[in-house]
Amino acid sequence: MGRWVGALSVLVWLSCPAPVEAAGVREAAVEYTGSEGAMPARLYIPEGGGRRGAVLVLHGIDGPQPVIEGFARDLAAEGFVTLTPDLFSLHEFASEGRVDHPLILGDLAGALAFVKQLPETHPVRIGVVGFSFGGRLAVLAAALHPEIRAAVNYYGVASYQELGNREVGGRALRSVPLTERVSAIRAAVLIQHGEADQTNPVEQGRLLHVALTRAGKRSLLYTYPGADHVFNFAGSRHHAEAARLSWERTVAFLREHLR
């Protein structure tokens, strides 16, 4: 098994099965240094020379899923280096929950350091895309890491305190609302939310957008009539038109800010 050893991480190109060569994209299993040591992730690199913008693609509360890998692969086919870190499998979380957990935030910092030092990436053209739990993380990462240029939040919670959900407690209830972190954000932010979201109401997206614009930050908000949570992935809640539009807007947004 071939290895490339860098100062921050080890990149392991798959030998069984072989690296995927689909639509001009190379795929690899990788490890990077996270909060508690080596963390697994998948890396997608478009073919062609030159340094490219890099995008972290963050999974939801269910952890890494094939649909997230597919999204990252498709984004790489558009010309971006993409990385999908597994933020859950190697940690044991207490019953108070995972929201804004220091271990996860440390893993995110490690993932950013990893993509910045890859020879295929431009170290100052870094973006983050996240879904639900990962959508909140994308914006939080932008607040904690000013080098991030673009953050895309798909239907993530802006403020657990504003949800009014009796089941919300523990770390989530004590978390700092994203609306109180906007002053630290330098990145442009794209918020995409279904208007029929039964898991995290669209008001959460609007709340964040208002806070960003009032703080003089760059924010775009798109809401999709009839679209529920996770509208852009296959399943009972899939909304074809919202999925198509949100994808096109994500790609255009990242091209604007990372190229």
What residue spans do the PLM features occupy?
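N-terminal cap/lid segment of alpha/beta-hydrolase-fold proteins
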Residues: 20-49
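Short beta-strand element of the alpha/beta-hydrolase
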Residues: 51-60
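Alpha/beta-hydrolase active-site loop
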Residues: 67, 98-119
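Short beta-strand/loop motif that positions the catalytic acidic residue
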Residues: 185, 191-193, 197
